[in-house]
Amino acid sequence: MSGDGGKSSKALTLVLLALVAASFSVAMYFQALNLMRTAGTSTTTSTASSVLTSTSPAATTRPWGSVTLSGAGASFLAPQMFEWSRALTETVGLRVEYQSVGSGAGRDMFFNKVVHFAGSDPPLSRELHEQYAGGVMQLPVVVGSVVIVYNIPEVPEGRSICLSSDVMALIYRGEIRYWDDQRILDVNPDLRGVLPHQEIVAVHRSDSSGTTSVLTAYLNKASPEVWSKGLVGFTVDWPVDAVGRGVGGKGNEGVTQVVKTTPYSLGYVELSYAITQRLPTAALRNAEGVCVKPTDQTVLNAVRNSTAFLPQSPLDDWSNVLPQMLNPPGRDSYPIVSFSYIFIYRVYPDRAVVEALREFIRWINTEGQERMVPGYLPITEEVRRVNLKAIELLEVGGT
Protein backbone atom coordinates (compact mmCIF):
# COMPACT_ATOMS: atom_id res chain seq x y z
CA MET A 1 0.00 0.00 0.00
CA SER A 2 2.75 2.45 0.89
CA GLY A 3 4.42 1.76 -2.47
CA ASP A 4 1.14 2.40 -4.32
CA GLY A 5 0.62 5.53 -2.25
CA GLY A 6 4.10 6.77 -3.20
CA LYS A 7 3.40 6.16 -6.87
CA SER A 8 0.09 8.00 -6.61
CA SER A 9 1.79 10.91 -4.88
CA LYS A 10 4.44 11.12 -7.59
CA ALA A 11 1.83 10.91 -10.30
CA LEU A 12 -0.16 13.71 -8.69
CA THR A 13 2.98 15.82 -8.45
CA LEU A 14 3.72 15.31 -12.14
CA VAL A 15 0.17 16.25 -13.06
CA LEU A 16 0.40 19.45 -11.00
CA LEU A 17 3.75 20.35 -12.58
CA ALA A 18 2.28 19.78 -16.03
CA LEU A 19 -0.65 22.06 -15.22
CA VAL A 20 1.70 24.78 -13.96
CA ALA A 21 3.83 24.51 -17.10
CA ALA A 22 0.75 24.67 -19.31
CA SER A 23 -0.52 27.73 -17.44
CA PHE A 24 2.88 29.40 -17.84
CA SER A 25 2.92 28.63 -21.57
CA VAL A 26 -0.57 30.08 -22.01
CA ALA A 27 0.42 33.18 -20.08
CA MET A 28 3.54 33.60 -22.20
CA TYR A 29 1.47 33.14 -25.35
CA PHE A 30 -0.96 35.91 -24.42
CA GLN A 31 1.90 38.16 -23.34
CA ALA A 32 3.56 37.67 -26.72
CA LEU A 33 0.25 38.23 -28.48
CA ASN A 34 -0.25 41.47 -26.56
CA LEU A 35 3.24 42.64 -27.50
CA MET A 36 2.44 41.96 -31.15
CA ARG A 37 -0.78 43.95 -30.92
CA THR A 38 0.83 46.93 -29.22
CA ALA A 39 4.06 46.99 -31.21
CA GLY A 40 4.76 50.19 -33.09
CA THR A 41 3.33 52.56 -30.47
CA SER A 42 6.78 53.76 -29.40
CA THR A 43 7.29 57.52 -29.60
CA THR A 44 10.75 57.18 -31.08
CA THR A 45 11.12 54.27 -33.51
CA SER A 46 8.47 51.86 -34.75
CA THR A 47 9.28 48.23 -33.92
CA ALA A 48 6.18 46.70 -35.46
CA SER A 49 8.03 45.34 -38.46
CA SER A 50 10.40 43.20 -36.37
CA VAL A 51 7.50 41.64 -34.44
CA LEU A 52 5.20 40.86 -37.34
CA THR A 53 7.54 39.59 -40.05
CA SER A 54 6.46 35.98 -39.54
CA THR A 55 2.99 36.80 -40.91
CA SER A 56 4.29 38.36 -44.12
CA PRO A 57 5.03 36.74 -47.48
CA ALA A 58 8.44 35.16 -48.02
CA ALA A 59 11.13 37.70 -48.85
CA THR A 60 12.03 35.88 -52.06
CA THR A 61 8.58 36.63 -53.52
CA ARG A 62 8.89 40.39 -53.07
CA PRO A 63 10.58 42.65 -55.65
CA TRP A 64 12.24 44.56 -52.79
CA GLY A 65 13.65 41.40 -51.21
CA SER A 66 14.65 41.90 -47.58
CA VAL A 67 15.14 45.69 -47.75
CA THR A 68 14.05 47.73 -44.74
CA LEU A 69 13.14 51.33 -45.56
CA SER A 70 14.42 53.91 -43.10
CA GLY A 71 12.87 57.30 -42.47
CA ALA A 72 13.18 60.09 -39.93
CA GLY A 73 11.61 63.44 -39.24
CA ALA A 74 8.43 65.07 -38.04
CA SER A 75 7.02 63.97 -34.69
CA PHE A 76 3.80 65.58 -36.04
CA LEU A 77 3.57 62.60 -38.43
CA ALA A 78 4.99 59.92 -36.12
CA PRO A 79 1.82 58.28 -34.69
CA GLN A 80 0.45 57.79 -38.20
CA MET A 81 3.78 56.55 -39.52
CA PHE A 82 4.05 53.98 -36.72
CA GLU A 83 0.60 52.63 -37.57
CA TRP A 84 1.50 52.44 -41.27
CA SER A 85 4.77 50.69 -40.43
CA ARG A 86 2.95 48.04 -38.44
CA ALA A 87 0.29 47.53 -41.10
CA LEU A 88 2.76 47.44 -44.01
CA THR A 89 4.71 44.62 -42.41
CA GLU A 90 1.55 42.73 -41.55
CA THR A 91 -0.17 43.08 -44.93
CA VAL A 92 2.55 43.18 -47.61
CA GLY A 93 5.74 42.24 -45.77
CA LEU A 94 7.46 45.60 -46.22
CA ARG A 95 9.52 46.73 -43.24
CA VAL A 96 9.59 50.50 -42.58
CA GLU A 97 11.44 52.05 -39.64
CA TYR A 98 10.73 55.67 -38.70
CA GLN A 99 12.52 57.85 -36.16
CA SER A 100 10.54 60.69 -34.57
CA VAL A 101 13.39 63.22 -34.36
CA GLY A 102 11.67 66.40 -35.57
CA SER A 103 11.37 67.82 -39.08
CA GLY A 104 14.69 69.68 -38.96
CA ALA A 105 16.79 66.71 -37.85
CA GLY A 106 14.94 64.41 -40.26
CA ARG A 107 15.69 66.72 -43.18
CA ASP A 108 19.37 66.78 -42.22
CA MET A 109 19.48 62.97 -42.09
CA PHE A 110 17.74 62.75 -45.47
CA PHE A 111 19.98 65.25 -47.25
CA ASN A 112 23.03 63.52 -45.77
CA LYS A 113 21.58 60.23 -47.09
CA VAL A 114 21.45 58.61 -43.66
CA VAL A 115 17.81 57.57 -44.29
CA HIS A 116 15.78 56.75 -47.40
CA PHE A 117 13.04 59.32 -46.74
CA ALA A 118 12.17 62.22 -44.45
CA GLY A 119 8.97 63.37 -42.78
CA SER A 120 8.32 67.11 -42.62
CA ASP A 121 5.38 69.34 -41.78
CA PRO A 122 6.34 72.28 -43.99
CA PRO A 123 7.30 71.63 -47.60
CA LEU A 124 10.71 72.65 -48.90
CA SER A 125 11.30 76.37 -49.10
CA ARG A 126 11.53 77.83 -52.58
CA GLU A 127 15.30 78.12 -52.17
CA LEU A 128 15.72 74.47 -51.20
CA HIS A 129 13.36 73.35 -53.95
CA GLU A 130 15.48 75.20 -56.50
CA GLN A 131 18.64 73.70 -55.02
CA TYR A 132 17.29 70.14 -55.37
CA ALA A 133 15.07 70.77 -58.42
CA GLY A 134 14.32 67.53 -60.24
CA GLY A 135 16.01 65.46 -57.56
CA VAL A 136 13.64 65.47 -54.59
CA MET A 137 9.92 64.64 -54.60
CA GLN A 138 7.47 65.98 -51.99
CA LEU A 139 4.36 63.96 -51.13
CA PRO A 140 1.72 65.30 -48.71
CA VAL A 141 0.48 62.13 -47.02
CA VAL A 142 -1.84 63.27 -44.19
CA VAL A 143 -3.84 66.28 -43.09
CA GLY A 144 -3.15 67.31 -39.51
CA SER A 145 -3.74 70.23 -37.19
CA VAL A 146 -1.70 72.08 -34.59
CA VAL A 147 -3.67 72.49 -31.38
CA ILE A 148 -3.10 74.43 -28.18
CA VAL A 149 -3.16 72.20 -25.11
CA TYR A 150 -3.32 73.61 -21.60
CA ASN A 151 -3.27 72.65 -17.93
CA ILE A 152 -5.50 74.94 -15.86
CA PRO A 153 -6.90 73.03 -12.86
CA GLU A 154 -9.60 75.67 -12.26
CA VAL A 155 -11.22 75.18 -15.69
CA PRO A 156 -13.70 72.32 -15.23
CA GLU A 157 -13.97 69.42 -17.62
CA GLY A 158 -16.46 70.18 -20.36
CA ARG A 159 -15.53 73.86 -20.57
CA SER A 160 -12.84 75.23 -22.84
CA ILE A 161 -10.84 78.39 -23.22
CA CYS A 162 -10.70 80.28 -26.51
CA LEU A 163 -7.57 82.01 -27.73
CA SER A 164 -7.11 84.54 -30.50
CA SER A 165 -3.94 84.71 -32.57
CA ASP A 166 -3.10 88.03 -30.89
CA VAL A 167 -3.39 86.49 -27.42
CA MET A 168 -1.26 83.48 -28.38
CA ALA A 169 1.39 85.73 -29.90
CA LEU A 170 1.47 87.96 -26.81
CA ILE A 171 1.76 84.93 -24.51
CA TYR A 172 4.76 83.60 -26.44
CA ARG A 173 6.23 87.09 -26.57
CA GLY A 174 6.03 87.18 -22.78
CA GLU A 175 3.71 90.19 -22.77
CA ILE A 176 0.68 88.39 -21.31
CA ARG A 177 1.76 87.07 -17.92
CA TYR A 178 -1.33 85.82 -16.07
CA TRP A 179 -4.27 83.62 -17.01
CA ASP A 180 -6.73 86.28 -15.82
CA ASP A 181 -5.23 88.98 -18.05
CA GLN A 182 -7.98 91.22 -19.40
CA ARG A 183 -7.04 90.39 -23.00
CA ILE A 184 -7.72 86.69 -22.32
CA LEU A 185 -10.95 87.51 -20.47
CA ASP A 186 -12.13 89.62 -23.41
CA VAL A 187 -12.14 86.43 -25.50
CA ASN A 188 -13.53 84.33 -22.62
CA PRO A 189 -16.13 86.43 -20.77
CA ASP A 190 -17.80 83.27 -19.46
CA LEU A 191 -14.58 82.34 -17.62
CA ARG A 192 -14.32 85.57 -15.65
CA GLY A 193 -13.83 84.51 -12.04
CA VAL A 194 -12.70 81.05 -13.19
CA LEU A 195 -9.35 81.79 -14.82
CA PRO A 196 -6.84 82.20 -11.99
CA HIS A 197 -4.26 84.89 -11.25
CA GLN A 198 -1.45 82.45 -12.00
CA GLU A 199 1.57 82.92 -14.25
CA ILE A 200 1.36 81.26 -17.65
CA VAL A 201 4.13 78.77 -18.44
CA ALA A 202 4.57 78.85 -22.23
CA VAL A 203 5.84 75.48 -23.47
CA HIS A 204 7.51 75.28 -26.88
CA ARG A 205 9.70 72.92 -28.85
CA SER A 206 13.38 72.73 -27.94
CA ASP A 207 14.38 70.98 -31.18
CA SER A 208 14.22 71.96 -34.85
CA SER A 209 10.52 71.51 -35.45
CA GLY A 210 8.09 71.56 -38.33
CA THR A 211 5.26 71.99 -35.83
CA THR A 212 6.97 75.18 -34.64
CA SER A 213 7.32 76.30 -38.25
CA VAL A 214 3.58 75.79 -38.84
CA LEU A 215 2.52 77.55 -35.62
CA THR A 216 4.81 80.55 -36.12
CA ALA A 217 3.80 80.89 -39.78
CA TYR A 218 0.17 80.98 -38.63
CA LEU A 219 0.87 83.64 -35.98
CA ASN A 220 2.66 85.77 -38.55
CA LYS A 221 -0.17 85.42 -41.07
CA ALA A 222 -3.00 86.03 -38.58
CA SER A 223 -1.26 88.66 -36.40
CA PRO A 224 1.63 90.14 -38.41
CA GLU A 225 1.72 93.30 -36.30
CA VAL A 226 2.41 91.20 -33.18
CA TRP A 227 4.39 88.26 -34.56
CA SER A 228 7.05 89.26 -37.09
CA LYS A 229 8.59 87.16 -39.86
CA GLY A 230 11.79 87.12 -37.83
CA LEU A 231 10.00 84.82 -35.38
CA VAL A 232 8.98 82.25 -38.01
CA GLY A 233 10.90 79.04 -38.55
CA PHE A 234 11.91 75.59 -37.36
CA THR A 235 13.73 77.11 -34.40
CA VAL A 236 12.81 80.39 -32.73
CA ASP A 237 14.41 82.63 -30.13
CA TRP A 238 11.28 82.68 -28.00
CA PRO A 239 10.84 86.08 -26.32
CA VAL A 240 9.01 84.39 -23.42
CA ASP A 241 12.24 82.57 -22.53
CA ALA A 242 13.94 85.90 -21.88
CA VAL A 243 11.45 86.70 -19.10
CA GLY A 244 11.79 83.25 -17.53
CA ARG A 245 8.36 81.84 -18.36
CA GLY A 246 9.20 79.65 -21.34
CA VAL A 247 9.99 75.92 -21.16
CA GLY A 248 11.21 73.69 -24.01
CA GLY A 249 10.17 70.12 -24.76
CA LYS A 250 11.71 67.79 -27.34
CA GLY A 251 9.25 66.63 -29.96
CA ASN A 252 5.48 66.69 -29.76
CA GLU A 253 5.98 63.96 -27.16
CA GLY A 254 8.09 66.23 -24.94
CA VAL A 255 5.77 69.24 -25.17
CA THR A 256 2.79 67.02 -24.31
CA GLN A 257 4.50 65.67 -21.19
CA VAL A 258 5.64 69.09 -19.97
CA VAL A 259 2.11 70.50 -20.27
CA LYS A 260 0.58 67.43 -18.66
CA THR A 261 2.85 67.73 -15.61
CA THR A 262 3.02 71.54 -15.29
CA PRO A 263 0.01 73.37 -13.85
CA TYR A 264 -0.90 76.67 -15.58
CA SER A 265 1.03 75.80 -18.72
CA LEU A 266 0.05 75.75 -22.38
CA GLY A 267 1.79 74.38 -25.44
CA TYR A 268 1.27 73.39 -29.07
CA VAL A 269 1.16 69.84 -30.47
CA GLU A 270 -0.42 67.83 -33.26
CA LEU A 271 -4.01 66.86 -32.39
CA SER A 272 -3.23 63.14 -32.15
CA TYR A 273 -1.01 63.75 -29.11
CA ALA A 274 -3.73 65.69 -27.31
CA ILE A 275 -6.20 62.87 -27.97
CA THR A 276 -3.81 60.15 -26.79
CA GLN A 277 -2.85 62.01 -23.60
CA ARG A 278 -6.39 63.31 -22.97
CA LEU A 279 -5.28 66.91 -22.71
CA PRO A 280 -7.86 69.69 -23.15
CA THR A 281 -7.53 71.71 -26.35
CA ALA A 282 -8.32 75.39 -26.74
CA ALA A 283 -10.80 76.71 -29.26
CA LEU A 284 -9.11 79.19 -31.60
CA ARG A 285 -10.68 82.35 -32.98
CA ASN A 286 -10.60 81.90 -36.74
CA ALA A 287 -10.54 84.33 -39.67
CA GLU A 288 -14.29 84.96 -39.27
CA GLY A 289 -13.90 85.77 -35.55
CA VAL A 290 -15.54 82.52 -34.43
CA CYS A 291 -14.04 80.34 -31.67
CA VAL A 292 -13.65 76.86 -33.20
CA LYS A 293 -12.50 73.62 -31.59
CA PRO A 294 -10.27 71.20 -33.53
CA THR A 295 -12.42 68.32 -34.81
CA ASP A 296 -12.42 66.18 -37.93
CA GLN A 297 -15.18 68.35 -39.36
CA THR A 298 -13.60 71.76 -38.62
CA VAL A 299 -10.25 70.57 -40.01
CA LEU A 300 -11.98 69.22 -43.12
CA ASN A 301 -13.80 72.55 -43.48
CA ALA A 302 -10.46 74.33 -43.39
CA VAL A 303 -9.07 72.14 -46.17
CA ARG A 304 -12.17 72.65 -48.31
CA ASN A 305 -12.17 76.42 -47.75
CA SER A 306 -8.45 76.81 -48.34
CA THR A 307 -7.40 78.80 -51.38
CA ALA A 308 -4.27 76.67 -51.80
CA PHE A 309 -3.32 75.94 -55.40
CA LEU A 310 -2.03 72.37 -55.58
CA PRO A 311 0.99 71.57 -57.74
CA GLN A 312 0.48 68.80 -60.27
CA SER A 313 3.70 66.85 -59.71
CA PRO A 314 5.71 65.64 -56.70
CA LEU A 315 8.68 67.40 -58.34
CA ASP A 316 6.94 70.80 -58.30
CA ASP A 317 7.44 73.64 -55.82
CA TRP A 318 5.02 73.17 -52.88
CA SER A 319 6.29 76.12 -50.81
CA ASN A 320 3.15 78.25 -51.33
CA VAL A 321 0.72 75.57 -50.13
CA LEU A 322 1.16 75.97 -46.36
CA PRO A 323 0.68 79.77 -46.22
CA GLN A 324 -2.55 79.40 -48.20
CA MET A 325 -3.87 76.65 -45.90
CA LEU A 326 -3.38 78.64 -42.68
CA ASN A 327 -6.21 80.79 -41.27
CA PRO A 328 -8.63 79.99 -44.13
CA PRO A 329 -12.08 81.58 -44.52
CA GLY A 330 -15.24 79.94 -43.21
CA ARG A 331 -17.15 80.23 -39.93
CA ASP A 332 -16.51 76.58 -39.10
CA SER A 333 -12.89 76.36 -40.27
CA TYR A 334 -10.16 75.49 -37.76
CA PRO A 335 -7.30 77.93 -38.41
CA ILE A 336 -4.07 75.87 -38.02
CA VAL A 337 -4.21 73.03 -40.54
CA SER A 338 -1.33 71.56 -42.49
CA PHE A 339 -0.30 68.67 -44.68
CA SER A 340 2.57 66.57 -43.42
CA TYR A 341 4.98 65.56 -46.19
CA ILE A 342 7.31 62.74 -47.08
CA PHE A 343 10.44 63.64 -49.05
CA ILE A 344 12.04 61.03 -51.30
CA TYR A 345 14.74 61.19 -53.94
CA ARG A 346 13.83 60.57 -57.56
CA VAL A 347 16.89 58.35 -58.10
CA TYR A 348 18.39 55.68 -55.82
CA PRO A 349 21.31 53.38 -56.69
CA ASP A 350 19.68 50.22 -55.28
CA ARG A 351 16.87 48.64 -57.30
CA ALA A 352 15.46 46.88 -54.24
CA VAL A 353 15.14 50.23 -52.45
CA VAL A 354 13.35 51.72 -55.46
CA GLU A 355 10.91 48.80 -55.54
CA ALA A 356 10.32 49.12 -51.80
CA LEU A 357 9.64 52.85 -52.14
CA ARG A 358 7.22 52.23 -55.01
CA GLU A 359 5.21 49.84 -52.84
CA PHE A 360 5.44 52.23 -49.88
CA ILE A 361 4.08 55.12 -51.96
CA ARG A 362 1.36 52.98 -53.53
CA TRP A 363 0.20 51.57 -50.19
CA ILE A 364 0.12 54.75 -48.08
CA ASN A 365 -1.84 56.54 -50.83
CA THR A 366 -4.41 53.73 -51.18
CA GLU A 367 -4.96 51.24 -48.33
CA GLY A 368 -3.03 53.45 -45.93
CA GLN A 369 -5.53 56.29 -46.28
CA GLU A 370 -8.15 54.00 -44.75
CA ARG A 371 -6.01 53.38 -41.65
CA MET A 372 -5.91 56.86 -40.15
CA VAL A 373 -4.95 57.31 -36.51
CA PRO A 374 -7.33 59.59 -34.53
CA GLY A 375 -6.20 63.18 -34.98
CA TYR A 376 -5.36 62.89 -38.70
CA LEU A 377 -7.46 63.04 -41.85
CA PRO A 378 -6.87 61.44 -45.26
CA ILE A 379 -5.56 63.52 -48.12
CA THR A 380 -7.93 64.51 -50.90
CA GLU A 381 -8.35 62.47 -54.07
CA GLU A 382 -6.56 65.20 -56.04
CA VAL A 383 -3.50 65.03 -53.77
CA ARG A 384 -3.52 61.23 -53.90
CA ARG A 385 -3.40 61.28 -57.71
CA VAL A 386 -0.43 63.66 -57.65
CA ASN A 387 1.41 61.50 -55.11
CA LEU A 388 0.96 58.31 -57.14
CA LYS A 389 2.86 59.91 -60.03
CA ALA A 390 5.99 59.44 -57.91
CA ILE A 391 5.86 55.68 -58.56
CA GLU A 392 6.67 56.19 -62.25
CA LEU A 393 9.13 59.00 -61.56
CA LEU A 394 11.35 56.85 -59.31
CA GLU A 395 14.44 55.52 -61.09
CA VAL A 396 17.49 53.38 -60.43
CA GLY A 397 20.78 55.12 -61.04
CA GLY A 398 23.64 57.09 -59.57
CA THR A 399 25.95 55.86 -56.86
Protein language model features and the residues they cover:
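N-terminal Lys/Arg-rich, disordered targeting/topogenic segments
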Residues: 1-8
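Flexible loop/hinge segments at secondary-structure junctions
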Residues: 11-17, 29-38, 52-53, 57-399
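Hydrophobic core
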Residues: 18-24
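Juxtamembrane proline-rich low-complexity "stalk" or linker regions positioned immediately after a signal peptide
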Residues: 41-53
